[in-house]
A protein has these predicted regions:
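Extracytoplasmic beta-sandwich strand-turn segments characteristic of Greek-key/jelly-roll folds
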Residues: 109, 113-114, 140-172, 271-276, ...
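Active/binding-pocket-proximal capping segment
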Residues: 302-315, 420, 446-473, 505-509, ...
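N-terminal secretory signal peptides
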Residues: 1-42, 53
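N-terminal edge beta-strand
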Residues: 97-115, 265-276, 411-435
């Protein structure tokens, strides 16, 4: 008999005892069986009957999704799921007297913290209580395309008022997350403008070090609206100069941009949620996630510094201490803070307007009270290469230039985005890549916008950032500033469709994506 599982309990600022954080890489994914149908079923016979209708098709689809084989295991579909995500309407009290109605997971924003063990298969239940089909993307995991949760990769969707169950093997270890991958276009009640996101932490197999608290903090913005003002990138000391491409400029003015009224960390505006409680002498491990639809952010903890140990869930070769973290949309940073400065402090964005509208959280030492303090951090450029090493990287077997372009939408219009001169075309033949072959992707940003670009179902290694060679830094999102280049190497680990796109929702919706097919 199949039962719906109890919903995980959401924790606004979860704290845990010491956990192991070592990583191992690239075990093979096995899709056992998937079924898209209404539930619950009252008997095993009814369930298996439903699985026959939906499961046979999905089993075939999984088999072609690059998993390296799949097996039918009816027993795996019985009993409670290991992970349940219920998609539905959520009311979020973000500030005193200010509530947001949105769509989220399991009745909360962020959704439940999902802790999994690397390489241990789990049964996942996705339950959609809304009137529209949904896509659930396991960001940063190496899984078959059919389970990756995108329309472009022909992934399985969760039908309106329906249910989807499948098996997946979590990998690789580290901080990942799960979020909707619906393309909302200008509908700000759908897609990543909503509260459909949750941390996924895949437990590694060995201990990364000592810490006293572990905190998961996700940033998000609310109440988006269209405007004509284009936000310019701030001047950052130490950042190489931008070099706009030669030739005539677009005669049309810039199109619509998106702005927000409210900013939150873990669904609460600064000063409204409970403070983070710490003690002097503690080592606190922070897992940060930029869960914004469109905004790149910076974060600082007044009176303290961050020891960065992982980027996008992957340990860095050379941990470094920094004053400010920068996260493009969908980037994650793991950093340890040594609590050596007793007081009541603000952890938040250096941008005063955004901080005053909520982007921050209070950090309070034991036996300390009073108004939280903010101290502006020094202005320095974020440099990925400081976390890399100097070893030589293997030469790529093929180099693929990817030139990012922009076509201004004009007043009252929407900008269009291109890769190598073309916007995304769902009817175009995907670019073929060979499994196991090392490719160098050259991200050549010829626009004045910063682009957090994301490659699905793989991590890539940074090899050159704004003219500085580097190696050893593995990521799945990298922020390419305006008029600059970043080079990365990737060796596709799984066959099947593989999506590349800008994680800025507005850019992705209006053309900034490309589909590969790994064979």
């Amino acid at each position: 008999m199949i039962h719906s599982t109890p919903l995980e309990t959401p924790v606004p600022n979860p704290t845990f005892v010491e956990k192991p954080v070592d990583r191992s890489w690239w075990s093979r994914e096995r899709c056992i069986l998937s079924a898209s149908m209404q539930f619950p079923f009252s008997t095993r016979r009814q369930f298996l009957s439903g699985a026959t209708l939906g499961g046979s098709l999905l089993y075939t689809a999984c088999r072609h999704g690059g998993a390296g084989g799949a097996s039918v295991d009816a027993e795996a579909l019985e009993g409670p799921a290991d992970v349940t995500l219920r998609i539905g309407t959520v009311k979020v009290d973000i500030a005193k007297g200010h509530a947001i109605s949105t769509t989220g997971y399991n009745g909360a924003v962020p959704g439940p913290l999902i802790r999994l063990r690397e390489g241990v298969p789990v049964t996942v239940d996705l339950v959609n209580d809304t009137a529209a089909a949904e896509l659930v993307h396991w960001h940063g995991q190496v899984i078959p395309a059919r389970l990756d949760g995108t329309e472009e990769e022909k992934s399985l969707e969760v039908p309106a008022h329906g249910h989807l169950r499948y098996r997946l093997t979590p990998q690789p270890a580290g901080a990942r997350f799960v979020h909707t991958h619906v393309m909302p276009m200008a509908d700000f009640m759908r897609g990543t403008y909503t509260g459909q996101f949750a941390f996924v932490y895949i437990e590694p197999k060995s201990n990364p070090g000592q810490y006293d608290q572990e905190l998961f903090l996700a940033t998000h913005e609310w109440e988006p609206s269209l405007g004509s003002e284009e936000e310019e990138e701030e001047d950052e000391p130490g950042l190489p100069p931008a070099t706009p491409p030669p030739g005539p400029k677009d005669p049309n003015p810039n199109g619509w941009e998106i702005g927000y009224q409210r900013f939150t960390i873990n669904g609460k505006c600064l000063g409204y949620g409970a403070p983070i409680q710490v003690k002097e002498g503690q080592r606190v491990l922070f897992h940060f996630l930029n869960a914004s639809a469109t905004e790149n952010i910076k974060l600082a903890l007044a009176g303290h510094q961050f020891d960065v140990i992982s980027l996008d869930g992957n340990p860095v070769p050379r941990p470094e201490r920094v004053d400010v973290l920068e996260l493009g949309t969908a980037e994650r940073i793991d950093a340890v803070v040594q609590m050596r400065n007793p007081g009541v402090w603000i952890l938040g964005t250096p941008k005063a307007d955004d901080r005053n509208n909520g982007m921050g959280i209070v950090v309070e030492y034991a036996n300390r009270k009073g108004q939280p303090r903010w101290i502006a951090p020094p202005k320095t450029a974020w440099d990925y290469t400081q976390f890399g090493d100097n070893r030589a990287t293997p030469l790529p077997q093929e180099t693929i230039p990817l030139v990012f372009g922009k076509i201004n939408g004009g007043k009252g219009g929407f900008n269009r985005w291109t890769i190598n001169g073309k916007g995304y075309d769902s009817k175009a033949e995907p670019r073929r890549l060979m499994k196991g072959k090392r490719y160098r992707l050259v991200f050549d940003n010829q626009t004045d916008d910063a682009h957090p670009v994301h490659l699905h179902r793989n991590s890539f290694e940074l090899t050159n950032v704004y003219g500085k060679p580097t190696s050893g830094v593995l990521k799945d999102v990298v922020l390419v500033k305006g008029y600059r280049k970043i080079e990365v190497d990737v060796t596709p680990a799984e066959e099947g469709l593989m999506l590349f796109h800008c994680h800025q929702q507005f850019h992705m919706d209006y053309g900034f994506k490309l589909l590969f097919n790994v064979v």
